[in-house]
């Protein structure tokens, strides 16, 4: 029998799956029901699971958070909300507000030809075969309850694509801003596809713009092709009311190189895997 923590999410999906699907892309929707069944079976990981030994996951997910299932636009000026300045680092700067790619403020400097940094659900709607090849392929929902939960609730997120042999010189910086007038749960998805010989550096910064209780789940899937090189730095500077659970999955081909670092400066509870 699912405890209260699980039950509210099972009930939520059963009552709202139509709304969730209506406001997302078919490729993301295609795996929801199976992920829901996996979550129903797995529930939240208990402390008996080695990698969750020190965190009471049920307690993190127990409070009643709001969710923006109807994709209402949340007013924010990201430039006012946050500066994530890293000295002497010149970046191409993008914003994700809660789980939605912010397309009103894009970097002035153009990326190399063919490189895409955009909304995951937008690209999934435009190129379903391409996204379908990668989405939810290495983030297995039958092995981790948190990944399953994220997969049946996530409606959007970020897609980064670097074509074959393209080297992105300038670091791509993505600032994830949590912004809400009520306590909010955010389920964000990130898909990174680096083709053969591609090279890029990413800096993801997590911030909270409001003094509210936030719960953010995030699943990152990174596919790194032969001889490709990926540097992924994740930096969190939120506040004590922030709960963050992030699972990272990386698939590497021959002679590829991945450097993944996570830095937590200020937070409430964070689980990075």
Locate the predicted segments by residue.
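Conserved beta-strand/loop scaffold segments within soluble protein domains that form the structured core
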Residues: 110-118, 126-273
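N-terminal amphipathic, basic helical "cap/leader" segment at the start of enzyme domains
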Residues: 2-148
